[in-house]
A protein has these predicted regions:
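Canonical alpha-helical transmembrane segments
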Residues: 84-120, 180
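Membrane-proximal helix-loop-helix units in multi-pass membrane proteins
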Residues: 117-182
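Juxtamembrane boundary at the C-terminal end of a transmembrane helix
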Residues: 211-223
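Membrane-helix boundary connector in multi-pass membrane proteins
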Residues: 176-197
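Perimembrane loop-to-helix junctions flanking transmembrane segments
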Residues: 71-90
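Transmembrane alpha-helical segments of multi-pass membrane proteins
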Residues: 52-56, 114-136, 195-209
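Membrane-helix interface motif
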Residues: 63-77, 130-148, 219-220
Length: 223
């Protein structure tokens, strides 16, 4: 019995033609003893992720406790260095540290290669945690700052408000962005608001509003 030709229809030179296809094409992927699980494990780079997680944990823990130790043991030196800085300037520094950390993390997610932005994220996080340690950031920070800094507690409180303002800005942005993803249809002209560049603009608008509230909303004189 003659085997029927193995044919396929393709567009060649703008015309529809029937071409013969080999029944046993040569494999384009070389043979390997690795299983699919082994291949996926290599692609996942577990060592790289372990180093990233370790770096993040170090950036969270070490700078905070170092800053806190300086605040407790070298209070006079810190007050002498920062005494001439306005509360608005201190709040701005805390806000900038959080924004840099978040932008580094966000860019690491959307940009390849991601490692330069991961470095930015870790450094920004370390700076934010160091400032948080110096300013005794916790849920009742105004008591801690008054005990440590006394009449100069306003400077530490300003740093805490800058950090918290930026963190609240991130939370508000996340809620707004998720809401846009849920409400706006893909066919809607407003879908442009869900693009990465538009989401970054939205983030900076929200963060700017949060900063203005901290600087000029009366919070620096209240806490």
């Amino acid at each position: 019995n003659e085997q029927e030709p193995n044919e396929a229809t393709e567009i060649v030179g703008g015309k529809v033609e029937t071409v013969e296809v080999s029944r046993h094409p040569e494999a384009s992927i070389p043979e390997t003893d690795l299983s699919l699980a082994d291949i996926e494990r290599r692609r996942s780079h577990p060592l790289r992720w372990a180093l990233i997680i370790l770096a993040v944990l170090c950036a969270i823990i070490a700078p905070y406790w170092f800053g806190r130790s300086l605040a407790v043991n070298n209070t006079d030196s810190i007050v002498a260095v920062l005494g001439g800085v306005s509360p608005q300037g201190i709040a701005l520094v805390g806000w900038v540290a959080v924004v840099i950390a978040y932008v580094g993390l966000a860019m690491a997610v959307v940009v390849s290669p991601s490692w330069p932005w991961l470095i930015v994220f870790v450094l920004g996080l370390a700076c934010e945690q160091f400032i948080a340690g110096l300013s005794m950031l916790n849920l009742n920070f105004w008591y801690s700052t008054y005990v440590v800094y006394g009449k100069q507690a306003g400077l530490a409180n300003a740093a805490n408000l800058g950090i918290m303002g930026a963190a609240i800005g991130i939370a508000v942005y996340a809620l707004v962005f998720v809401g846009l993803l849920v409400i706006i249809r893909k066919t809607s002209p407003l879908n442009v608001l869900t693009k990465s560049w538009a989401s970054f603009i939205l983030y900076f608008v929200i963060e700017t509003i949060a900063l203005l509230v901290v600087l000029f909303g009366g919070l620096l004189t209240t806490v």
